[in-house]
Swiss-Prot record:
Gene Ontology BP term (one): DNA damage response
InterPro entries: DDIAS, NA-bd_OB-fold, Rep_factor-A_C
Chain positions covered by the region annotation Disordered: 191-210, 643-670, 710-749
Chain intervals with Polar residues compositional bias: 643-664, 710-725
Functional summary from the UniProt entry: May be an anti-apoptotic protein involved in DNA repair or cell survival.
Comp. bias regions, Low complexity: 726-741
PANTHER family with a match to the protein in the record: DNA DAMAGE-INDUCED APOPTOSIS SUPPRESSOR PROTEIN, DNA DAMAGE-INDUCIBLE APOPTOSIS SUPPRESSOR PROTEIN DDIAS
Domain of life: Eukaryota
This protein's GO CC annotations: cytoplasm; nucleus
Induction: Strongly induced by a wide range of stress signals: nitric-oxide, gamma- and UV irradiation, hydrogen peroxide, adriamycin and cytokines and this induction is dependent on p53/TP53. Expression is low in resting cells and increases almost 50-fold as the cells progress through the S phase.
Protein name: DNA damage-induced apoptosis suppressor protein
Amino acid sequence: MNKRRKFLFASVLAVQNSNFIYPSCQRCFSKIILESKRFTCPKCGSSGDTGSTNYRYKLSLKVAESSKLFFITVFGSCLDTFFGLTATGLHRYLGDSIKNLETLDSGRTQSLLTTAVEKCFVGQSFVFGVTNFGDVCGHDSDSSNFQQPCCKHRGEVRTLVASQIILPSPHVKGFTVIAYLHPLLHKKPHCGSQEHSSQSLTSDDSDSDLNNIQGSGNTSWFSESSVGEDFFRYWEPSLELTSSDSQVTSSDDFPASKQIMASGTPNQNRHCISVSEVTSSKNCHDSLQSLWSLHSCMDKNNTTGKLGEELGLPSPVCNSCHESRLSDSHFFPSQMQEPFEEHNLECYSKAEKNDYSQYDIACYQHHEVNTTPILQQRSSAFSLSSLKPEETANPSQNSDSLIWDDLPLSESLNKFLAVVESEVAVTEIDAKNRKQGMDKSIDKCHKNYSRLSLTPWRNTRALNTSCFSLRSSQAMMKDSGKEALFSNCKSNSSPHIQKESKADKTEAAVSIAGSRSDISEDFLPDTCSSALFTSSKDREAFITQKRTSGVLQQRNEISCRPSTSISDCSDLRSRYFTGCGQKLHSGTKGKLAIQNCSKKYSDASDLHKLENKHRWPKKEDDNFTICRKLTYPLETLCSSPESINTSKEMPYRPSNNNLTPSSSGDHEGSYNASADLFDYIAKDKDIGTEITKIPQDNLLPLEVPCTENYPINENRGQPSQKPSLQSISPSRYSRPRSQSDSECDFEESQDFVPCSQSTPVAGFHQRIHGLNGASKILPSIYSNPNANYKNRKNSPLTGQYQATSACSKNVKAFRQKPESPFVSSLTQANVFNHCPAAESLGNDVDEWVPPTTKKVFISDILGFRVMGLRKCLDLHYSPDPKELPRKKLIKVTHKTNI
């Protein structure tokens, strides 16, 4: 007889039978009679050997749909997915277990099997394909009135037969019966027979059993079985419930699997209670335990409630004696929202709701929100269960079912998005607060700039700071420190920002304070400079950075420059002290320790002398006047006479044309001023010669002493470079960089050499001549600025340096008093590099400026005292009788056609 299948969506409440398999006929699926060696089918009469007996599943369940109860008996191989193996395989497995395990008998084995079946099915929701729905209710199966109650069986529990059981959603997962049964069979027996009853399904047993199932050592038992069947620990993903044409289902012989695959998938099959879905970040054991121990929950909770919108769970079941066809456009009737009256479903739904709302919402509140991973995690952990039938009837919602699958189990979309958006808003507020804090830290650093710029000086003499110096120092602070400070603030290095800003601001403060002509006696005290650095590591990092700008050199400079106006001199003076003031943060009188002098320069190979030659074109007769000047360092006086056989080569480097005040270690550039000051400069370790182009007719007497005594600095060295022998650009020249940590002595000449302003600048050649024809490159010597930082001894009142006995005979330190400045025809930024400081002045580069023929003394303008070179030498030191003879400036004339 052809019957149409009706589908019923219901939840399993209990297991009604204990015998889940029976021997069946392979033709009519009826129960056969087993004899000693053969079997016989009473319905069709077929027979066969007992060894070829086939078994079939039979499972009787008590289910609930809405407020109605049904007894449904499921037959066939559709249960293979949930048991994990076929019925024949299960029969063989039980027989082998009884033989292998002496403690097991048939009664205990059957009891344990019942327990495993209950754990697998109770509390789950399935779609049952019912075959006798119309016969039981007494209505025509073709009737469209599915909501009419059954008058004959009013108040009775109806019994239905199902040949199909389908998971409502492919996302629902669970353990199979065999996965529960195996740990129960191999579990050690306990005293008492109550464990073997069906009441043993408690939370403790469920916890221990599930832990045994999840153990890593429980997978080997499948291979040990002699059944040879394929076992599954988890439910296989079954095909979803699909709608098909009524003509397809008219034949009972048409397989159910083909009926499912006949048409598209409606979204009604997703209206299920995904009880085995992991609903939180808790382990799988906790989630499955709360779902599979439904009977215990039912006994403890006797309250009743509705399953409507409050719990977020659907009730897609029919009233009594109603059915739903596959061919109907509405898979479930409109009265599916009738709430369950069974308290077990209320208990389940409350447990699910509390599990999500208490744990997962707390996770949103305590962790940083990342919207995309959260949605992906929730979509994998939850299946759609709160969708209403009216919503599923909407075609637009059916077309995008995957979006609804991402929704949580017990949370509406609005609530879910509200939680996420609130956390995103909190994150944005935190970002704004961090940005404001960063801005405040930058403002604080700028305030530290201005505070450091007003650092008091040790000397009681008032320092008049010009507006020009103040403006230039402020511009210098903005240009040099703004970008570095902002980048460091973004990298969360506030302490480093403050340290760096302090170091830069110190230069600015010194630059402002050094705008007077008596800057040589107004230095930053040692205590102030030490306070700017919190540790020796900071001083080392700061001084090392400044050391890279150049190396220490000893040189004498002879330059002339005319003065045109007082305003030009003022501008020159402000520029001069702005550049020189950046070298003054280490001490007032400078601290010079010469203890390491004999260590680093005792070798005769380190003593050199330099001879540079430059040519200047003369306008009148095209003659070149070459001024040769030889200078001897202090080392020659402190070492053996054999050290004179080597020559020292000084590095000459090209540099930029602009002189701009800045707080960095390198100061490069040139400026066009009408007046300039030149001096003999006594530097620390090496000697450099500055060659000046002088017309032939203005050459001074050559009896200028060039040998001087120099104080030695222990913290600076000079890397050697071979000078270029090729012609250098006529518009630019380079000079060696200089760097000093303490005060140096000035000695100037009374003579000056005016030059013609209209004389064009021509190329010149540089030749290095060493004594006895030998030349050697001075090796690079670097020293740790912190190593001897504390060894420097300076008298705060006299400003004199304490030298070792190795050099004390020929070295005398005295106050820096420039004598006899003259007007120079060359605009050079490093003419004033004689200023003592702990930082290096910038690159020694300047652009040649056409000279002038005016001869002007600017001693009154700049406030310096004029003192002759010989007078200065007589006052400050007496030459050693063993001192090397001084060489004179040799006048050589060449004629050249320009």
